Amino acid sequence: MRWALAGASTIAAEHVIDALRAAGEDVAVVQSATTARAGEFARMQGIAGFGTDLDAILADTGIGAVYISSTNEKHHAQALAAIRAGKHVLCEKPLAMTVAEAAEMVAAARAQGVVFATNHHLRCSGSHRAVRGLIASGRIGRVLSLRLFHAVHLPGHLQGWRIDNAAAGGGVIPDITVHDADVARFLLGEDPVSVVAQMASSGMGQGVEDSVMSVWSMPSGAMVMAHESFTHPFAGSGLEVHGTEGSIFATGVMTQQPVGEVALVTASGREAVPYPTHNLYTQAVADFLAAVAGKGRPAADGRDGVASLAVALAVRTAAETGQRQMVNYGGAA
């Protein structure tokens, strides 16, 4: 299948293009805001076509799918254009700036009969799938709590709009909290009901938050605590799941690489948990292509993207107001 890229992004260059090509897909054209940017990206990535007019690119009936990795405020319009042109869409998170916009994208894809997926890469990780399996099999009993620690140092080449442009969707909440919301939903199989939160600009953010802590209430009664930041170079990342019969400790697993350690602790002692170390993006592409072929579903579909955005927006509102916020899924939950 021939693909168009909407956005000449770092994630496309470092991960997604290689994953598409590894699956035998043809990355045919890239769109960006300027001809110079699109042309340079195309040259560097060995892509034959480039341009600034997405509608013209979408008019090519030979294009079967679009990967969207532009800045966040562009996702909604670009996805709707691609969907209405009959293309399958893999869209970066957050899907949009509002839950209503994201829900509109999902509804449009359903009406058009195309696959619409959210690129939540962490649920493609072998480590996360192993943790989910342990929980589902009852190895730790009833889940009591989940702790997500995802405070990192944002590399210089990724800062830009993420640390100073609220209009483009900057800030750590749409960048990382949205991922952690998906992780919690994936692992626990339920949607957060309400959240409390506190956020700060702790040295990197200029007009946007660069650090946030939040606690989420789950329907089962489990509690989730999440910590995300752009300003913590030595914190490490990971997750802990604690249950009535055991605990799971997964360290170094909140990354784009298939790395980290997973351990299960029960009354019998501590044991290392093996997991497959496949490429996360290769898995995401494989699941997407299976869905296109009618043989499965994407790793994270559009509804998953709506839900993760809803949680992230509730976290921001809770932090802004200092009050507990119910999560508004816009009818998608």
Which stretches of residues belong to each language-model region?
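Rossmann-fold dehydrogenase core element
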Residues: 104-121, 141-146
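Contiguous beta-strand/loop segments that form the cofactor/metal-binding neighborhood of enzyme cores
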Residues: 182-255, 282-295, 330-333
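Predominantly a Rossmann-like dinucleotide-binding segment in NAD(P)-dependent oxidoreductases
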Residues: 122-205, 322
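Beta-loop-alpha module in the N-terminal Rossmann-like domain of NAD(P)-dependent dehydrogenases
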Residues: 45-108
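Active-site loop of classical SDR/Rossmann-like NAD(P)-dependent oxidoreductases
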Residues: 11, 33, 274-286, 300
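Hydrophobic residues in well-ordered beta-strands that form the structural core
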Residues: 12, 51, 91, 116-118, ...
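C-terminal helix-rich "cap/oligomerization" subdomain common to oxidoreductases
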Residues: 5, 65-68, 290-333
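N-terminal Rossmann-like dinucleotide-binding module
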Residues: 1-45
